């Protein structure tokens, strides 16, 4: 019964703020999980800034993002180099005041490196207000596993894990700040290679898990992950079903 009540209250809040017009951009602080198809783009809208946690996907709601963020300082946090997490940089408006607060680890293709080089590094990243860890380096490989190099960030109770696989989860999920997470953005869009039992055991205070994915084409979130989340009695929301998800 407690789970049902928690889900109902949270659903009401989501419906309320999902209907909030973007013209009220100065009314409150909130976070938006954008419906970008298969990919990830989450924006924390604040009084004088927008913080973007990955900027990738199959499509981008540029008009809505512009309404909220074009007149503010934009901080970009990139978990790793995969295109469905960084692709928005290719069309990023040059007129916006923007900097990279967290670049991906290591190097990538010449094209991606050149694209990232267009942006200045942030001088003020407000590190005390967000936490990150760098997964163990994988040694000298010709083709490193970029998913395993995903950087993990918690901001305002929301846990962003990039495409971090189960093996890497076992390393960073023991950090002391992980259990305080209230919202989990599913790793690797809900792939069966992420969101382990160990991680869910470590995040018992979760109010909701969110899948930024497209099941119709990619079968994410995977049925095994959905079942795992259900066993832990964590409500699961999907951008494919809800559209943009607003969190206050």
Residue map of PLM features:
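Core dinuclear metal-dependent hydrolase active-site scaffold
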Residues: 2-75, 118-186, 241-248
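Solvent-exposed loop/turn segments at secondary-structure junctions
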Residues: 38, 57-60, 81-85, 106-108, ...
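Short amphipathic alpha-helical segments
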Residues: 64-66, 88-91, 113, 172-174, ...
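Short, conserved loop/helix-junction motifs that constitute active-site signature segments
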Residues: 69-71, 92-96, 176-180, 199-206, ...
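Di-metal (Zn2+ and/or Mg2+/Mn2+) metal-binding site signature of metallo-dependent hydrolases
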Residues: 71-96, 105-106, 188-198
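Receiver (REC) domain switch-region micro-motif
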Residues: 73-76, 99-101, 184, 209
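Binuclear metal-ion centers of metallo-dependent hydrolases, dominated by the metallo-beta-lactamase
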Residues: 97-149, 172, 208, 213-248
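Catalytic cores of nucleophile-dependent amide-cleaving enzymes
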Residues: 181-199, 205-209, 213-218
């Amino acid at each position: 019964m407690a789970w049902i009540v928690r889900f109902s209250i949270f659903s009401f809040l989501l419906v309320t703020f999902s209907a909030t017009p973007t013209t009220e951009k100065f009314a409150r602080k909130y976070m938006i999980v954008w419906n970008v198809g298969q990919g990830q783009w989450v924006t924390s809208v604040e009084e004088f800034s927008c913080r973007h946690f990955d900027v990738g996907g199959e499509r981008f709601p540029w008009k809505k993002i512009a309404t909220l963020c074009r007149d503010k300082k934009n901080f970009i946090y990139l978990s790793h180099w995969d295109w469905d997490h960084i692709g928005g940089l290719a069309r990023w408006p040059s007129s916006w005041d923007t900097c990279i607060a967290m670049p991906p680890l290591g190097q990538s293709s010449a094209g991606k490196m050149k694209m990232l080089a267009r942006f200045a590094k942030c001088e003020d990243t407000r590190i005390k207000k967000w936490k990150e860890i760098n997964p163990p380096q994988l040694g000298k490989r010709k083709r490193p596993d970029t998913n395993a190099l995903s950087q993990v960030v918690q901001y305002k109770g929301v846990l962003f894990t990039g495409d971090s696989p189960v093996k890497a989860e076992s390393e960073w999920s023991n950090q002391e700040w992980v259990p305080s997470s209230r919202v989990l953005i599913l790793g690797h869009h809900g792939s069966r290679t992420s969101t382990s039992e160990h991680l869910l055991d470590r995040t018992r205070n979760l109010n909701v898990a969110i899948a930024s994915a497209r099941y119709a084409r990619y079968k994410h979130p995977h049925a095994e992950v959905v079942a795992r989340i259900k066993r832990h009695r964590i409500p699961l929301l999907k951008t494919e079903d809800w559209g943009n998800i607003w969190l206050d």
